[in-house]
């Protein structure tokens, strides 16, 4: 009897019908994504404020909870309670759909993020391409939001977001394809398993150093983080495509930005840093299939360690992105496009061709 059947039997024993039990079971992954990703955003916001304060020799959030840990929750509650205003001459449909089109694809990206061999919500054979496809939808929402606001700053911000996404989506996809060639699979689980054979020496960061650097730069640009935050440059565009937004719609953009940053960090961990595996080769807890208390306890420990290791590696990338915000100047729009088309695209394409040539030579 597998875990799903056990949960259905437990729900049926309390008086629920089998169909209702199956429906509730299908809702569990959705709740896991919503709660886990939201908690991750709260942690990232708190970390960014604390690290930013340390860089500037300040204290940062301190009074809202221990060490200011619930400051982000208070800010989110404030945005939810604010009035939702739609511009008088704007397009209400585009203005309202834009934020949802930004957040929903990012939430769906968490379906293919593995935290263990069996600890993944949807182990798709084309999982990595699924993420690339979803990440290309969000800029459409930004463009709709900018156009629907009937504001020149918002429209320019939306155009910048679309141009930036097109420029950096291609190098990002080419870097991902290079990793897929090495792993002989597009499944995120298979990519992590391929890196686990030789411990830390088997990580793709050593086999794909050029692709790793290109992936980091493209990821920062996709997340619109400094020095690539051209779509919402405060000195030039007030707040870019967010200028006319307030209340919960503005909060959706805010959450979507950090969700995208977190999922990018998780994919850095999965693609290049070995995912949930330990750094030492052949050291791992086995997944026991027997149904006794010891096996259950060991599987829980294994799953907990997998989640902790994956998040630890991901937060290393988050730390670097937060430091980059306060150490690097914002680039101009022409420099942004030149970096994407004239540098990252040739480098990532050359890296893909080199990887394919080496793989053919080893056949």
Swiss-Prot record:
GO terms for cellular component: chloroplast thylakoid membrane. It catalyses: a plastoquinone + NADH + (n+1) H(+)(in) = a plastoquinol + NAD(+) + n H(+)(out); a plastoquinone + NADPH + (n+1) H(+)(in) = a plastoquinol + NADP(+) + n H(+)(out). Its main location: plastid. One of its GO terms (molecular function) is oxidoreductase activity, acting on NAD(P)H, quinone or similar compound as acceptor. Keywords: Chloroplast, Membrane, NAD, NADP, Plastid, Plastoquinone, Quinone, Thylakoid, Translocase, Transmembrane, Transmembrane helix. It holds the Pfam family NADHdh. It is found in: Plastid, Chloroplast thylakoid membrane. It is an enzyme of class 7 (translocase). Its EC number is 7.1.1.-. The chain crosses the membrane at residues 27-47, 93-113, 124-144, 162-182, 200-220, 250-270, 303-323, 343-363. It comes from the Eukaryota. One of its GO terms (biological process) is aerobic respiration. It is a multi-pass membrane protein. NDH shuttles electrons from NAD(P)H:plastoquinone, via FMN and iron-sulfur (Fe-S) centers, to quinones in the photosynthetic chain and possibly in a chloroplast respiratory chain. The immediate electron acceptor for the enzyme in this species is believed to be plastoquinone. Couples the redox reaction to proton translocation, and thus conserves the redox energy in a proton gradient. NDH is composed of at least 16 different subunits, 5 of which are encoded in the nucleus. Belongs to the complex I subunit 1 family. This is NAD(P)H-quinone oxidoreductase subunit 1, chloroplastic. It comes from Chaetosphaeridium globosum. The gene is ndhA.
